[in-house]
Protein backbone atom coordinates (compact mmCIF):
# COMPACT_ATOMS: atom_id res chain seq x y z
CA UNK A 1 0.00 0.00 0.00
CA UNK A 2 1.42 3.39 -0.99
CA UNK A 3 1.68 6.16 1.55
CA UNK A 4 -0.35 9.38 1.06
CA UNK A 5 1.45 12.27 -0.59
CA UNK A 6 2.60 14.84 1.99
CA UNK A 7 0.99 18.25 1.75
CA UNK A 8 3.13 21.25 0.86
CA UNK A 9 3.32 23.69 3.77
CA UNK A 10 1.48 26.37 1.78
CA UNK A 11 -1.40 23.91 1.37
CA UNK A 12 -1.67 23.02 5.06
CA UNK A 13 -5.15 23.87 6.35
CA UNK A 14 -3.69 26.01 9.15
CA UNK A 15 -1.60 28.08 6.73
CA UNK A 16 -4.54 28.58 4.37
CA UNK A 17 -6.84 29.52 7.24
CA UNK A 18 -4.38 32.17 8.42
CA UNK A 19 -3.99 33.58 4.92
CA UNK A 20 -7.53 33.37 3.60
CA UNK A 21 -9.88 32.66 6.53
CA UNK A 22 -11.73 29.58 7.79
CA UNK A 23 -14.53 29.93 5.23
CA UNK A 24 -12.11 28.98 2.43
CA UNK A 25 -11.41 25.55 3.93
CA UNK A 26 -13.36 22.41 3.05
CA UNK A 27 -15.15 20.38 5.72
CA UNK A 28 -12.38 17.73 5.83
CA UNK A 29 -9.75 20.47 6.19
CA UNK A 30 -11.59 22.05 9.11
CA UNK A 31 -11.81 18.65 10.77
CA UNK A 32 -8.09 18.18 10.12
CA UNK A 33 -7.33 21.27 12.21
CA UNK A 34 -9.19 19.74 15.16
CA UNK A 35 -7.55 16.34 14.64
CA UNK A 36 -4.09 17.95 14.26
CA UNK A 37 -2.45 14.79 12.91
CA UNK A 38 -3.49 11.81 10.86
CA UNK A 39 -3.03 8.13 11.53
CA UNK A 40 -0.85 5.48 9.92
CA UNK A 41 -1.21 5.72 6.14
CA UNK A 42 -3.69 8.59 6.33
CA UNK A 43 -3.03 12.31 6.83
CA UNK A 44 -5.37 14.53 8.85
CA UNK A 45 -7.32 15.77 5.81
CA UNK A 46 -7.86 12.22 4.58
CA UNK A 47 -8.96 11.23 8.08
CA UNK A 48 -11.48 14.08 7.95
CA UNK A 49 -12.79 12.71 4.63
CA UNK A 50 -13.07 9.25 6.15
CA UNK A 51 -15.03 10.52 9.17
CA UNK A 52 -17.50 12.42 6.98
CA UNK A 53 -18.01 9.38 4.77
CA UNK A 54 -18.40 7.03 7.74
CA UNK A 55 -21.01 9.16 9.54
CA UNK A 56 -22.85 10.57 6.54
CA UNK A 57 -21.52 14.13 6.36
CA UNK A 58 -21.46 16.98 8.84
CA UNK A 59 -25.04 16.48 9.98
CA UNK A 60 -24.41 12.83 10.75
CA UNK A 61 -21.12 13.64 12.45
CA UNK A 62 -22.84 16.27 14.59
CA UNK A 63 -25.10 13.56 15.98
CA UNK A 64 -22.20 11.23 16.81
CA UNK A 65 -21.41 10.22 20.38
CA UNK A 66 -17.88 10.14 21.86
CA UNK A 67 -18.15 6.36 22.15
CA UNK A 68 -18.83 6.05 18.42
CA UNK A 69 -15.84 8.24 17.61
CA UNK A 70 -13.53 6.15 19.75
CA UNK A 71 -14.12 3.00 17.71
CA UNK A 72 -12.92 4.62 14.47
CA UNK A 73 -9.68 2.79 13.60
CA UNK A 74 -6.65 4.85 14.57
CA UNK A 75 -8.60 7.79 15.97
CA UNK A 76 -7.77 7.11 19.61
CA UNK A 77 -9.14 8.55 22.82
CA UNK A 78 -7.38 11.93 22.63
CA UNK A 79 -8.56 12.76 19.10
CA UNK A 80 -12.05 11.42 19.83
CA UNK A 81 -12.32 13.67 22.90
CA UNK A 82 -11.16 16.78 21.02
CA UNK A 83 -13.57 16.09 18.17
CA UNK A 84 -16.42 15.37 20.61
CA UNK A 85 -15.77 18.73 22.30
CA UNK A 86 -15.86 20.57 18.95
CA UNK A 87 -19.11 18.84 18.01
CA UNK A 88 -20.66 19.66 21.39
CA UNK A 89 -19.80 23.33 20.86
CA UNK A 90 -21.60 23.15 17.50
CA UNK A 91 -24.67 21.65 19.20
CA UNK A 92 -24.62 24.39 21.82
CA UNK A 93 -24.46 26.99 19.06
CA UNK A 94 -27.75 25.60 17.73
CA UNK A 95 -29.20 25.80 21.25
CA UNK A 96 -28.10 29.42 21.59
CA UNK A 97 -29.81 30.20 18.29
CA UNK A 98 -33.04 28.70 19.62
CA UNK A 99 -32.76 30.81 22.77
CA UNK A 100 -32.53 33.93 20.63
CA UNK A 101 -34.94 33.14 17.81
CA UNK A 102 -38.61 32.36 17.32
CA UNK A 103 -38.76 28.57 16.99
CA UNK A 104 -41.94 28.69 14.89
CA UNK A 105 -40.26 30.99 12.37
CA UNK A 106 -37.19 28.74 12.16
CA UNK A 107 -38.40 25.15 11.63
CA UNK A 108 -35.14 24.13 9.93
CA UNK A 109 -33.15 25.27 12.96
CA UNK A 110 -35.44 23.22 15.22
CA UNK A 111 -35.01 20.13 13.05
CA UNK A 112 -31.22 20.52 12.98
CA UNK A 113 -31.14 20.88 16.76
CA UNK A 114 -33.30 17.79 17.26
CA UNK A 115 -31.20 15.76 14.83
CA UNK A 116 -28.01 16.78 16.62
CA UNK A 117 -29.53 15.81 19.97
CA UNK A 118 -31.10 12.51 18.92
CA UNK A 119 -29.66 11.30 15.63
CA UNK A 120 -26.91 9.20 17.22
CA UNK A 121 -29.00 7.56 19.95
CA UNK A 122 -29.19 3.77 19.89
CA UNK A 123 -32.43 3.53 21.87
CA UNK A 124 -35.51 5.73 21.75
CA UNK A 125 -35.28 9.06 23.58
CA UNK A 126 -37.87 11.79 23.75
CA UNK A 127 -36.98 15.41 24.47
CA UNK A 128 -39.13 18.48 25.03
CA UNK A 129 -38.14 21.99 24.03
CA UNK A 130 -39.95 24.29 26.46
CA UNK A 131 -40.59 27.73 24.93
CA UNK A 132 -41.54 31.12 26.35
CA UNK A 133 -44.33 33.39 25.10
CA UNK A 134 -42.07 34.64 22.30
CA UNK A 135 -41.40 31.01 21.29
CA UNK A 136 -37.77 31.17 22.35
CA UNK A 137 -36.13 28.23 24.08
CA UNK A 138 -36.24 28.14 27.88
CA UNK A 139 -34.78 24.68 28.33
CA UNK A 140 -34.49 21.36 26.54
CA UNK A 141 -35.19 18.37 28.77
CA UNK A 142 -35.27 14.62 28.28
CA UNK A 143 -38.75 13.34 29.10
CA UNK A 144 -38.39 9.65 28.23
CA UNK A 145 -35.81 6.99 27.46
CA UNK A 146 -36.72 3.53 26.30
CA UNK A 147 -35.70 0.62 24.12
CA UNK A 148 -34.79 0.17 20.48
CA UNK A 149 -38.44 0.42 19.47
CA UNK A 150 -40.27 2.46 22.10
CA UNK A 151 -40.05 5.01 24.89
CA UNK A 152 -42.83 5.37 27.45
CA UNK A 153 -43.93 9.00 27.55
CA UNK A 154 -46.08 10.29 30.42
CA UNK A 155 -48.12 13.39 29.54
CA UNK A 156 -48.40 14.38 33.22
CA UNK A 157 -44.60 14.67 33.47
CA UNK A 158 -44.49 16.94 30.43
CA UNK A 159 -47.32 19.06 31.87
CA UNK A 160 -45.57 19.30 35.25
CA UNK A 161 -42.32 20.47 33.64
CA UNK A 162 -44.18 22.98 31.49
CA UNK A 163 -45.68 24.51 34.63
CA UNK A 164 -42.33 24.46 36.44
CA UNK A 165 -40.60 26.33 33.63
CA UNK A 166 -43.55 28.68 32.99
CA UNK A 167 -43.61 27.55 29.37
CA UNK A 168 -46.13 28.96 26.92
CA UNK A 169 -45.46 26.35 24.25
CA UNK A 170 -43.29 23.35 23.55
CA UNK A 171 -41.92 21.12 20.83
CA UNK A 172 -41.50 17.39 21.29
CA UNK A 173 -38.92 15.28 19.49
CA UNK A 174 -38.06 11.61 19.59
CA UNK A 175 -35.90 9.26 17.56
CA UNK A 176 -36.49 6.02 15.67
CA UNK A 177 -33.17 4.16 15.99
CA UNK A 178 -32.54 2.12 12.87
CA UNK A 179 -35.98 3.03 11.54
CA UNK A 180 -37.51 5.64 9.29
CA UNK A 181 -38.47 9.22 10.04
CA UNK A 182 -42.20 8.59 9.82
CA UNK A 183 -44.94 8.94 12.41
CA UNK A 184 -46.49 5.66 13.53
CA UNK A 185 -50.10 5.33 14.62
CA UNK A 186 -48.84 5.17 18.22
CA UNK A 187 -46.81 8.36 17.71
CA UNK A 188 -49.87 10.19 16.40
CA UNK A 189 -52.13 8.98 19.21
CA UNK A 190 -49.62 9.88 21.93
CA UNK A 191 -48.96 13.30 20.41
CA UNK A 192 -52.65 14.14 20.39
CA UNK A 193 -53.00 12.95 23.98
CA UNK A 194 -50.13 15.22 25.04
CA UNK A 195 -51.58 18.14 23.06
CA UNK A 196 -54.91 17.74 24.86
CA UNK A 197 -53.21 17.56 28.28
CA UNK A 198 -51.21 20.72 27.56
CA UNK A 199 -54.31 22.55 26.34
CA UNK A 200 -55.78 22.20 29.84
CA UNK A 201 -53.02 24.47 31.17
CA UNK A 202 -53.07 26.74 28.10
CA UNK A 203 -49.74 25.52 26.73
CA UNK A 204 -49.48 25.01 23.01
CA UNK A 205 -47.84 21.97 21.40
CA UNK A 206 -46.24 23.42 18.27
CA UNK A 207 -44.68 20.34 16.74
CA UNK A 208 -43.41 16.82 17.27
CA UNK A 209 -40.23 16.09 15.32
CA UNK A 210 -39.23 12.53 14.52
CA UNK A 211 -35.54 11.80 13.94
CA UNK A 212 -34.03 8.78 12.22
CA UNK A 213 -30.29 9.18 11.78
CA UNK A 214 -29.76 12.25 9.59
CA UNK A 215 -33.44 12.40 8.55
CA UNK A 216 -36.18 14.36 10.31
CA UNK A 217 -39.90 14.82 9.80
CA UNK A 218 -42.33 17.34 11.28
CA UNK A 219 -45.63 15.91 12.45
CA UNK A 220 -47.13 19.40 12.28
CA UNK A 221 -46.11 19.74 8.63
CA UNK A 222 -47.75 16.37 7.93
CA UNK A 223 -51.03 17.51 9.48
CA UNK A 224 -50.89 15.28 12.55
CA UNK A 225 -51.36 18.18 14.98
From Swiss-Prot:
Keywords: Hydrolase, Metal-binding, Metalloprotease, Protease, Zinc. Zn(2+) binds at residues 174, 176, 187. One of its GO terms (biological process) is proteolysis. It comes from the Bacteria. Disulfide bonds: none annotated. Gene3D superfamilies: Cytidine Deaminase, domain 2. Residues 103-225 form the MPN domain. The keyword Glycoprotein does not apply. One of its GO terms (molecular function) is metallopeptidase activity. The keyword Ion transport does not apply. It holds the Pfam family UPF0758_N. A motif (JAMM motif) lies at residues 174-187. PANTHER family: DNA REPAIR PROTEIN RADC, UPF0758 PROTEIN YEES-RELATED. Belongs to the UPF0758 family. This is UPF0758 protein BB3258. It comes from Bordetella bronchiseptica (strain ATCC BAA-588 / NCTC 13252 / RB50).
